[in-house]
């Protein structure tokens, strides 16, 4: 809104980037008004692009530009991962999740799923991220009898995040739509986990299916379905070969479809054209 008002005051064109919450919790009339007024808009998922195009009088203004990863600034992935299969109590499978402790991340559903895992499987869960539901989630883990297996690391610097990705065996994100309509787009952490060589279990929420294809480069279950999530986790825990297969395919998907460079190049080109157009108009 501030950019739009400043542009109107100066008589300049303006552009906008929409992500997730701003798409799904904004009033449709407000989004439509801004889309009619801007020069162009970008968003980071096809699902979001379709929503904005439906609201825009000029659907061609809305472009899909995935965030992607800047591979040059990421640590090299681990070449060898432990082949834990959950059979050794002294060497449990490490399950990692990263994200804010808020409703749309589905951590309550994930704890329910972990509690449903077969007693014969040995695992431990690590979580990275801050958030308003921290105390509630810890209390839930206590009630479910899994608190001793759960480590809540809180917010961590990037170096520690990638260290956690390196030591984990499996990444899980149980995203869902929150009661207020907020939902994820395509969480970057999924692409980061894949780049680091981790296999992924997630949900069909939001735009996750634009990256993870169930049964090809990971496993997806319906959002909020703790029993299905537990079954997918158990399958991954007990089959290190399957984890390796999915991890390899997910990493290839990241490398071939989700490079940071393509999106930056498009945005730079569009901004450059706007500047040149204004310069010609001022002559």
Where are these predicted regions, by residue range?
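Acidic anion/phosphate-binding donor-loop and adjacent secondary structure
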Residues: 26-30, 53, 69-86, 90-91
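Carbohydrate-associated surface elements
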Residues: 47, 68
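Conserved donor-binding/catalytic core segment of Leloir-type glycosyltransferases
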Residues: 86-105, 111-114, 126
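Nucleotide-activated donor-binding/catalytic signature segment of Leloir-type glycosyltransferases, i.e.
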Residues: 136-159
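Acidic donor-binding loop of glycosyltransferase active sites
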Residues: 166-181, 198
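Short hydrophobic beta-strand element within catalytic cores of glycosyltransferases
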Residues: 190-195, 199-202, 212
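Short acidic/histidine- and often glycine-rich active-site loop of Leloir-type glycosyltransferases
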Residues: 202-215, 219-220
């Amino acid at each position: 809104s501030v950019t739009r008002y400043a542009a109107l005051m100066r008589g300049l064109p303006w552009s906008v980037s929409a992500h997730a919450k701003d798409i799904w919790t904004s009033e449709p009339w407000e989004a439509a008004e801004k889309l009619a007024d801007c020069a162009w808009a970008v968003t980071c998922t096809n699902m979001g692009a379709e929503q904005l195009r439906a609201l825009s009088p000029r659907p061609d203004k809305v472009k899909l530009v995935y965030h992607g990863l800047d591979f040059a600034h990421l640590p090299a992935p681990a070449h060898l991962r432990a082949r834990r299969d959950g059979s050794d109590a002294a060497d449990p499978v490490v399950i990692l999740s990263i994200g804010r402790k808020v409703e749309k991340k589905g951590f309550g559903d994930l704890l329910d799923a972990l509690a449903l895992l077969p007693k014969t499987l040995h695992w431990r869960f690590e979580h990275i991220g801050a958030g308003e539901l921290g105390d509630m989630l810890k209390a839930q883990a206590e009630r479910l009898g899994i608190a001793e297996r759960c480590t809540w690391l809180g917010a961590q610097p990037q170096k520690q995040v990638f260290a956690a990705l390196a030591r984990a065996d499996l990444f899980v994100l149980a995203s869902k739509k929150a009661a207020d309509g907020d939902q994820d787009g395509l969480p970057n952490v999924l692409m980061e986990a894949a780049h680091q060589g981790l296999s992924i279990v997630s949900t069909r929420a939001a735009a996750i299916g634009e990256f993870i294809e169930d049964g090809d480069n990971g496993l997806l279950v319906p959002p909020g379905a703790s029993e299905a999530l537990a079954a997918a986790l158990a399958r991954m825990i007990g089959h290190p070969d399957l984890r390796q297969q999915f991890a390899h395919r997910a990493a290839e998907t990241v490398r071939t479809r989700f490079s940071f460079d393509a999106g930056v190049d498009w945005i730079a080109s569009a901004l450059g054209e706007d500047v040149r157009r204004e310069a010609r108009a001022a002559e």
